[in-house]
């Protein structure tokens, strides 16, 4: 019997009882936490290079936000959301995605017309899915939203941003897939024909697909349970219903991508999982040669009606999101190694030394140096092997033979005298010595 099936009385009688994390959630620590933070830091730096500002919104939102934006017939709203009533009987939801929350925040705080109209985010999302590789009930997304007029250049820039971000990880088999869902009028004309076509195959649909057939047949194309069947593959293509202006913009985008050496393929079946998308949609897909399967690692698109739908003005926007855990899986398979930072150990010979050096150590850390120190065990010979085994390259200590305070390179044994120097002089000398030693080491390779 699992612990969550036990009564309170039974739990009280279980000695050494251990509560486990819920199914589909993760703990990150040590190497996993380093990898997690590395991905967030990489995204943050890339987002700021493209002039995005950070935005944070609540994990908890009103259910209606996602019902109105993501779409009633989507898998996320119809099957996967964590929904509950609060004590005031208001229907709440844990956010399954971030775009709706970001737009709600921008509308509510009157930021839609703000000059700073690019925002990036990261945080936990929640979907009640069957946990498997790359799919979790709590997962972390990084993403961005750009409130910008519909143009082929803004479409291109968002793809360039996504491509540059993923380029930091040197994945071998990542394919950019793009499609155009058209504007509202084009899509409505298409849906009329799509509905007529699907009515011929009503007997092949389950209850959920029949509901989608009436409310939004486009969602049937996104259903992974049936979209491999021939009658789905042979359905009318939305691209055939686009007007010349929409097609021209899409062609311009393709030319920009070619000129920038960003390889891509057009996937006319690509619709994405949310109802708010129109015009450009895209996914960066990783192809696993061993399992011959595809894993979407980043996806997004343009949305022209969501801002107005959530009470704002008629305004265009575009954005994307990526799953951090999926990126972690791929980087771990690539045998990712934590970027090495030069580390220093400051040895304190006694408690007096320890208190005297606290400010010195803090100021070294402020100079972007990784510094460790001993707070007990004041015998250097007892901890020297541990310092070396941790990969620490530089040691600052009082050398009794030389009667000097020195910084020593533990690899080549070079050292520099720091005796009788002011704290600021010591810090500058340490920084210069480390830079010089690292430069000489790199030149000798």
Swiss-Prot record:
Gene Ontology BP terms: histidyl-tRNA aminoacylation
Sorted UniProt keywords: Aminoacyl-tRNA synthetase, ATP-binding, Cytoplasm, Ligase, Nucleotide-binding, Protein biosynthesis
Record bears the keyword Aminoacyl-tRNA synthetase: yes
A GO term for molecular function: histidine-tRNA ligase activity
Pfam family, one: tRNA-synt_His
Subcellular location: Cytoplasm
Cellular-component GO terms for this entry: cytoplasm
Reactions performed catalytically: tRNA(His) + L-histidine + ATP = L-histidyl-tRNA(His) + AMP + diphosphate + H(+)
Main location: cytoplasm
Keyword Aminoacyl-tRNA synthetase among UniProt keywords: yes
Enzyme Commission number(s) from the entry: 6.1.1.21
Top-rank taxon, per record: Bacteria
Enzyme class of the recorded protein, top EC level: ligase
Family: Belongs to the class-II aminoacyl-tRNA synthetase family.
Matches recorded under HAMAP family: His_tRNA_synth
Stored NCBIfam families: hisS
Subunit structure: Homodimer.
UniProt-recorded name of the protein: Histidine--tRNA ligase
Species the sequence originates in: Mycoplasma mobile (strain ATCC 43663 / 163K / NCTC 11711) (Mesomycoplasma mobile)
Name of the encoding gene: hisS
């Amino acid at each position: 019997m699992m612990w969550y099936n036990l009564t309170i009385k039974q739990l009280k009688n279980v000695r050494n009882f251990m509560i486990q994390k819920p199914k589909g959630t993760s703990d990150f620590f040590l190497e996993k936490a380093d990898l997690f933070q590395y991905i967030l830091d990489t995204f943050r730096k890339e987002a700021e290079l493209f002039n995005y500002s950070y935005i944070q919104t609540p994990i908890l939102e009103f259910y209606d936000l996602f019902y109105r934006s993501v779409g009633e017939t989507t898998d996320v709203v119809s099957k996967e959301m964590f929904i509950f009533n609060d004590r005031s009987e208001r229907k709440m939801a844990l956010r399954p995605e971030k775009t709706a929350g970001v737009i709600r925040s921008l509308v509510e705080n009157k930021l839609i017309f703000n000059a700073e109209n690019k925002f990036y985010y990261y945080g936990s999302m929640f979907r009640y899915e069957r946990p498997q590789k790359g799919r979790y009930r709590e997962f972390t997304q990084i993403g961005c939203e750009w409130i910008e007029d519909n143009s082929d250049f803004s479409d291109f820039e968002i793809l360039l941003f996504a491509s540059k971000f993923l380029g930091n990880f040197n994945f071998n088999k990542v394919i950019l897939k793009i499609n155009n869902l058209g504007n509202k009028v084009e899509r409505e004309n298409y849906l009329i024909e799509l509905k007529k076509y699907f009515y011929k195959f009503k007997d092949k649909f389950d209850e959920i697909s029949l509901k989608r057939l009436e409310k939004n047949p486009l969602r049937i194309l996104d259903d992974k349970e049936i979209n491999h069947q021939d009658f789905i593959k042979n359905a009318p293509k939305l691209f055939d219903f686009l007007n010349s202006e929409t097609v021209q913009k899409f062609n311009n985008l393709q030319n920009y991508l070619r000129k920038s050496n960003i390889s891509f393929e057009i996937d006319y079946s690509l619709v994405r999982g949310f109802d708010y998308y129109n015009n450009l949609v895209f996914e960066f897909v990783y192809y696993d040669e061993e399992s011959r399967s595809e894993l979407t690692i980043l996806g997004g698109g343009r949305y022209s009606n969501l801002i107005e739908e959530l009470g704002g003005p008629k305004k265009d926007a575009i954005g994307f999101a990526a799953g951090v855990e999926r990126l972690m899986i791929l980087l771990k398979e690539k045998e990712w190694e934590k970027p090495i930072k030069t580390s220093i150990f400051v040895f304190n010979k006694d408690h007096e030394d320890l208190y005297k050096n606290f400010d010195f150590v803090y100021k070294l850390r402020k100079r972007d140096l990784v510094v460790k120190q001993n707070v007990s065990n004041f015998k250097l010979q007892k901890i020297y092997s541990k310092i070396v085994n941790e990969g620490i390259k530089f040691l600052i200590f009082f050398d009794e033979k030389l009667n000097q305070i020195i910084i020593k390179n533990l690899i080549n044994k070079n050292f520099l005298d720091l005796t009788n120097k002011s704290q600021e002089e010591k810090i500058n000398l340490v920084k210069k010595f480390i830079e010089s030693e690292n430069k000489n080491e790199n030149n000798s390779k």
